[in-house]
Amino acid sequence: MKLNNLVFDFDKFAFEMANLKEKKHFDYLVTIVGEDFGGEEGLGCIYILENTKTNERTSVKMLAKRVGENDFVIPTVTGIWKVADLLEREVFDFVGIKFLGHPDM
């Protein structure tokens, strides 16, 4: 299955993800995969979303913003999908990306 790889600006990420849920009905966050894309891209995540009524899936690629020397951050989506709480903490543990606004980070 080939998925779209949507990419959003850092500052609009949370807004665009909320639009995917509310307007496009991607009501289920399947997973978040933390990754080192290498080179200039650096660390980031792939989000897999599903519309459970149509079974349509899409993916979103979000590059982490470097803060300081060794910190990488992405805005949290815990306010949009509750399951993001655990998925984001797992990415933090394995890859080191911090999620801005996460309730337990």
Language-model regions, residue ranges each:
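Terminal low-complexity/charged segments
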Residues: 1-105
